[in-house]
Design a protein with these regions (language model features):
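Conserved alpha/beta-hydrolase "acid-adjacent" motif
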Residues: 73-83
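Short beta-strand/loop motif that positions the catalytic acidic residue
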Residues: 66-68
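Alpha/beta-hydrolase-fold enzymes
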Residues: 1-29
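Active-site nucleophile elbow and catalytic-triad environment of alpha/beta-hydrolase enzymes
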Residues: 35-56
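Acidic beta-to-alpha connecting loop that harbors the catalytic carboxylate
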Residues: 70-73, 104-105
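Catalytic active-site module of serine/aspartate enzymes centered on a nucleophile-bearing elbow/loop
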Residues: 91, 95-129
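Short, proline-enriched alpha-helix->beta-strand connector loops that line the catalytic pocket
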Residues: 58-64, 91-94
Length: 129
């Protein structure tokens, strides 16, 4: 949340849309503390699926559309999506496209630019058909 000071809430990193952040805060199934084991399992899984032998299991001709916000701290402030695209290309996946949305944060489908995101995804799908 340090990137978004002054902060209105501890969850401002999720979206620029204050209503969406408030919905997250008020949802009893969101924002709860995770156990150390949960984090260990999550991170171990992410490490495992990013290995070359795992990426090679994805069909190399499968079209992929990666998108995110350039202010998403989980996506390394816009660096994660292009890095993933590069890694996929290095493993022989040649039909990979990405788009970063300026100033957008973590929850792209709950962002202030969500209409653009939905339209861009729909356009990409149509191009694949």
């Amino acid at each position: 949340n340090n990137h978004f000071k002054p902060n209105r809430t501890n969850f401002d990193w999720l979206s620029r849309d204050a209503d969406q952040v408030d919905k997250y805060i008020n949802d009893p199934l969101c924002g709860f503390p995770c156990s150390a084991e949960t984090w260990q399992q999550l991170l171990s899984g992410l490490i495992e699926i990013s290995k070359k032998d795992q990426l090679d299991k994805i069909p190399h001709t499968l079209p992929m559309y990666l998108f995110g916000g350039d202010k998403d701290p989980v996506g390394r402030m816009g660096k994660g999506i292009p890095a993933l695209e590069q890694k996929l290309r290095q493993t022989g996946h040649d039909n990979v496209t990405h788009k970063l949305y300026k100033e957008a944060r973590h929850e792209m489908l709950n962002e202030t630019c969500k209409d653009d995101v939905y339209q861009d995804v729909a356009n990409w799908i149509e191009q694949q058909l």
